[in-house]
Structures are given as structure tokens and as C-alpha cells.
Curated annotation (Swiss-Prot):
Lyase among keywords: no
PANTHER family per UniProt: FORMATE DEHYDROGENASE, SULFUR CARRIER PROTEIN FDHD
GO biological process, any: Mo-molybdopterin cofactor biosynthetic process
Keywords: Cytoplasm, Molybdenum cofactor biosynthesis
GO terms, molecular function: sulfur carrier activity; sulfurtransferase activity
InterPro entries: Cytidine_deaminase-like, FdhD
Name the UniProt record assigns to this protein: Sulfur carrier protein FdhD
Catalytic residues identified in the record: C123
Gene label: fdhD
Record localization: Cytoplasm
Length: 277
């Protein structure tokens, strides 16, 4: 597995009104590398991610795309033995999966997903070409929650306390899954916020925990449509974010009966959808 951080010596520039100072100092940056995802021999997509928890990421991505519903549908997940770098070592940047739908009548629509998945660490709307497609994905049923505001305001700080890679680099997002009692069950960090969410959801999927009723997806980023949709596909009834919520995220949360809050900072937040306890 590749490194998740890289150490550099970089010029540090300080500019004042009268003089510019330049000093060399050590810096730690987050690693971003491609992960090529192959499903049943088909090159589905290449996503830019922070190495680590790759199999969780892919499970979460396949769930979000509607290609799987249960971890048992992924019969094999392995790194490609032929993916080697200039040093003749395995780069662990090509992941091959064998997927067999639990329902034999359900076909894997790899072509439409493959055609539209972009190559990015902020992958955005994955595998879709229209608003109708965005809204048509069917995940686990949502059972609404009524979270306590006093619990909600504690979650960003709890998430921040577990952002070890951010402490070192300042360059990654974090996602966490919390119970309604405010316990963080799992936290993942990545250069892409969507990757972080996929890793969290993929972890729970691989441990047989779906649907994720009575939980909240906690994000260190803004609350975009894609994150709300990923949560909905996993049956997560609530999303909170330290940043803003987008219009489509709000509309989607309201239509799905989900709870959504943004700008959760200090003792305040904006309440966009759902009911409070």
C-alpha cells in the first residue's frame, strides 16, 4: 500500500511591506494517487484518492451507483498483480472486482456508469447524465429521525479530534458515521470528500450493517447533493456538515424524509430538512 503522506522541503515565503523573507522548511502533504477500478473485467473508472481503505471505497462507490446492494455481491476484490511502477513494485493502484448480483434478474448496467464516471478526487455526480437519473436511484428505505440539537453540535468537534491526517497535512476531508447518542462509529479521511464518505459507508456495508438506520453522516465539508444521495442509498437518515448545503441537497433530503443540517459550528447550525427532537 502506498504512503498516505509525503514529506518535502519547501520554501516558506513571508512578505511584509518592506521585505520578502524566504526560508526552507519541512512540509507534510497528503498523497493523491489514481485508483483504477475494474468490475468483471471492465474498466469502470479511475478515481483520484488517498491510498488506504480502497476496498471500502469501492464497496461504497458501487453501492452509491446502484451496482450492488449487499457486500456478498462482491465475490472477489484484489489488487492487480501486473500493476507495477518504475521500481518494479506493485503500486496497488488497480483494483479488480468480481460482482455477481444477488438477484439474477438484475443486470449490472456497467456501460452507463462507466461512460459518465469522471476521473477526480471530488468525483461529483457519478454515473449520471440527467436530473431524472439523479433522483431515480433506489437505495434502502429511509426511516426518519428526530436528533437532539445538543447532540448535533458536538459532532463536528468529535470528528475533528479524529482527523489525524488533517493534523499532519491540512489537506484532506473527513467523514464519520454517528449514532443518535453522538458516538462516532467510524471515521475516514481522504483528499476527496466523496471518497471519505464512500469509505465510511463501504466499511459498514462490508461489516453487514446496512441499512444504517438511526445514524448520521458527519462531513467536514459542505453538504452537496452527492453526499446526501450516498447517505440515502445506504439508508442513513441524516447528514450534517460544517459547511453550507446546496439547493439540490436540501431538496433531496426533504423529498427523502431525511434530516439535514449545515454550518454546524460552535453551538449553532442551519436546519434545512427533517425534524428536531
Amino acid at each position: 500500500m502506498g504512503r498516505i503522506t509525503q514529506h518535502l522541503q519547501v520554501p516558506r515565503v513571508v512578505s511584509t511591506e518592506t521585505k520578502v523573507f524566504v526560508n526552507t522548511r519541512p512540509d507534510t502533504i497528503a498523497v493523491e494517487e489514481p485508483l483504477e477500478i475494474r468490475v468483471n473485467g471492465t474498466n469502470l473508472t479511475t478515481t483520484m484518492r488517498t491510498p488506504g481503505h480502497d476496498i471500502e471505497l469501492v464497496h461504497g462507490l458501487l453501492l452509491a451507483e446502484g451496482l450492488i446492494r449487499d457486500a456478498s455481491e462482491v465475490s472477489t476484490a484484489r489488487y492487480c498483480a501486473g500493476a507495477v511502477g518504475p521500481d518494479n513494485q506493485n503500486t496497488y493502484n488497480v483494483l479488480e472486482l468480481d460482482v455477481v448480483p444477488a438477484n439474477p434478474r438484475r443486470e449490472l448496467n456497467l456501460v452507463s456508469v462507466q461512460r459518465n464516471l469522471p476521473t477526480s478526487s471530488a468525483c461529483g455526480v457519478c454515473g449520471t447524465t440527467s436530473i431524472e437519473q439523479l433522483m431515480d436511484k433506489k437505495g434502502w428505505p429511509i426511516e426518519p429521525i428526530t436528533p437532539d440539537p445538543r447532540m448535533i453540535i458536538t459532532l463536528p468537534e468529535k470528528l475533528r479530534e479524529r482527523q489525524k491526517m488533517f493534523d499532519k497535512t491540512g489537506g484532506v476531508h473527513a467523514a464519520g458515521l454517528a449514532t443518535l447518542d453522538g458516538e462516532l462509529l467510524v471515521v475516514r479521511e481522504d483528499v476527496g470528500r466523496h471518497n471519505a464518505a464512500d469509505k465510511v459507508i463501504g466499511h459498514m456495508l462490508m461489516n453487514g450493517r446496512l441499512p444504517l438506520r438511526d445514524t448520521i453522516l458527519v462531513m467536514s465539508s459542505r453538504a452537496s447533493f452527492e453526499l446526501v444521495q450516498k447517505a440515502a442509498m445506504a439508508g442513513i437518515p441524516g447528514v450534517i456538515a460544517v459547511g453550507a448545503a446546496t439547493s439540490l441537497a436540501v431538496d433531496t433530503a426533504r423529498d427523502a424524509g431525511m434530516f439535514l443540517a449545515g454550518f454546524v459550528r460552535g453551538n449553532k447550525f442551519n436546519h434545512y430538512a427533517g425534524e428536531l427532537g
